[in-house]
């Protein structure tokens, strides 16, 4: 199924396309939510702290593949909007080759450097064994992550956001069932939680690859006119590398903060591990709406429909900011019951710290909603470098402030929490100023920009 996003009512078209993406990534978060819930309830705060720290690392590695897939998807969307079938097919081949090679390199690197990675994360000595046990298994899932993200990005770029949702739904349910079986039933500890996630990742990755091969042969089955051209590889790399850099910087910043959080001990680590899962789950809808808006904009950019892009910007801004505000209110009010989903009610210190985090950062989700729209807009308009700049500003300020404030007794760990919305605010301001100054040239006829 293909959907042309260059026609139809703007708001309705965007929402119809965005909703399956939002639901799909909510399902993807269920991988991590299930691990956290089950590990926290059955294995205790120490195991939860180890899995939470490992999650930050896996998020960083996944962001590399996700960034490459998202950058490739932008090019696919432009070609689809231009009705350039040959360019689309050659771009798909180039992208698959690039992402496959990066996946192999990542797999080798992380297995060789696992002990060094654990040291860099400042993991407490009593958690090193648990974290190593979890990481050895979870790293094996990178190929499954590659397959899912590549084919999901391809299908979304041609307007099909439903099929990726279906495969993630099956995978998420399987993950929860296997988590309970391996951890609670077979007593396999943190390794069991990792095994459940890896199996589920391969189910979604292989499943969506087979679906695309069978149902969309015109996209991926090679014909004589299609070959691996280095011009296509360079084009894909130019978009993908910058988007990958953006995603990696985002998660590298989080990883840097994780090391600082770890220095405050197991209680803060466990609180952060649970709160970050709630955090990611809460703002995920606006993140995915920003990605859907980016694909909508890229297709229309390829088709040269700048008036439709302007209408899309207005509609997306209103929708995303309103939703972000509603989520902020909900998380602020429900912070304590949300924490008790992950942490036993007896762990009062962990719950209190997690609530404090959520009521500081969660009050400002509308700021990150605006930032995700800016990321998507600049990526779709052929300016992925600006998305990188905004990410550097947001994360750079977050990390710098966190490390500056945390050692001061007056702030302590609260300084880490406050650094996040401050980074969002300053990046939003820069992105908006740049758009207002450059909007006439940014929205010029796209046919001149994607030849």
Indicate residue ranges for each PLM-predicted region.
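Residue-level signal for short hydrophobic patches within transmembrane helices
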Residues: 7, 11-30, 34, 57-64, ...
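Transmembrane helical elements of multi-pass membrane transporters/channels
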Residues: 16-35, 137, 148, 171, ...
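Helix-terminus/linker motif at the lipid-water interface of multi-pass membrane proteins
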Residues: 26, 30-49, 118-125, 181-188, ...
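Short runs within selected transmembrane alpha-helices of multi-pass transporters and secretion channels
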Residues: 69, 137-156, 164-172, 193-208, ...
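Short alpha-helical transmembrane segments in multi-pass integral membrane proteins
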Residues: 1-18, 76-143, 185-241, 297-364, ...
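Hydrophobic transmembrane alpha-helices of multi-pass small-molecule transporters
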Residues: 60-63, 175-179, 205-209, 281-284, ...
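Small-residue-rich hydrophobic transmembrane alpha-helices
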Residues: 48-108, 145-164, 271-335, 368-390
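Small-residue hotspots at the loop-to-helix junctions and early N-terminal turns
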Residues: 45-56, 135, 194, 266-281, ...
């Amino acid at each position: 199924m293909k959907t042309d996003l260059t026609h139809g009512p703007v708001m309705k078209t965007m929402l119809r396309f965005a909703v399956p993406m939002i639901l799909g990534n909510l399902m993807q978060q269920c991988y991590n939510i299930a691990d956290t819930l089950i590990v926290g309830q059955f294995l205790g705060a120490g195991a939860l702290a180890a899995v939470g720290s490992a999650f930050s690392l896996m998020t960083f590695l996944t962001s590399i593949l996700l960034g490459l897939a998202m950058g490739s998807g932008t090019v696919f969307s432009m070609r689809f909007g231009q009705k350039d079938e040959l360019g689309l097919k050659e771009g798909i081949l180039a992208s698959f080759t690039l992402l496959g090679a990066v996946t192999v390199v990542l797999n080798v690197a992380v297995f060789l450097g696992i002990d060094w990675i654990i040291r860099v994360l400042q993991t407490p000595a009593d958690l090193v064994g648990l974290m190593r046990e979890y990481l050895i298994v979870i790293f094996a899932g990178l190929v499954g992550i590659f397959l899912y993200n590549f084919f999901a990005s391809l299908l979304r770029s041609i307007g099909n956001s439903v099929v990726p949702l279906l495969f993630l739904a099956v995978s998420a349910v399987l993950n929860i069932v296997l988590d309970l079986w391996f951890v609670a039933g077979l007593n396999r500890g943190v390794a069991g939680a990792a095994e459940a996630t890896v199996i589920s990742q391969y189910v979604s990755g292989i499943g969506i690859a087979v679906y695309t091969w069978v149902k969309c042969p015109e996209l991926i089955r090679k014909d004589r006119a299609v070959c691996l051209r280095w011009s296509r590889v360079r084009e894909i790399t130019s978009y993908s590398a910058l988007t990958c850099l953006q995603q990696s910087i985002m998660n590298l910043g989080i990883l840097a903060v994780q090391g600082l959080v770890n220095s405050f001990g197991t209680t803060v680590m466990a609180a952060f591990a649970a709160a970050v899962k709630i955090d990611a789950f809460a703002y995920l809808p606006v993140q995915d709406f920003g990605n859907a808006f980016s694909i909508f904009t890229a297709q229309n950019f390829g088709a040269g429909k700048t008036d439709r892009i302007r209408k899309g910007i207005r509609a997306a801004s209103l929708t995303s900011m309103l939703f972000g505000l509603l989520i902020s209110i909900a998380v602020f009010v429900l912070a304590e019951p949300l924490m008790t989903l992950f942490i036993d009610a007896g762990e009062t210190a962990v719950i209190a710290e997690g609530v404090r985090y959520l009521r500081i950062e969660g009050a400002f989700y509308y700021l990150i909603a605006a930032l995700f729209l800016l990321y998507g807009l600049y990526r779709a308009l052929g300016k992925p470098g600006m998305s990188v700049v905004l990410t550097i500003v947001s994360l750079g300020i977050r990390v710098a402030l966190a490390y500056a404030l945390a050692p001061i007794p007056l702030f302590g760990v609260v300084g880490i929490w406050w650094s996040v919305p401050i980074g969002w605010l300053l990046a939003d301001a820069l992105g908006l100023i740049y758009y207002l100054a450059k909007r006439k040239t940014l929205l010029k006829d796209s046919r001149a920009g994607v030849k």
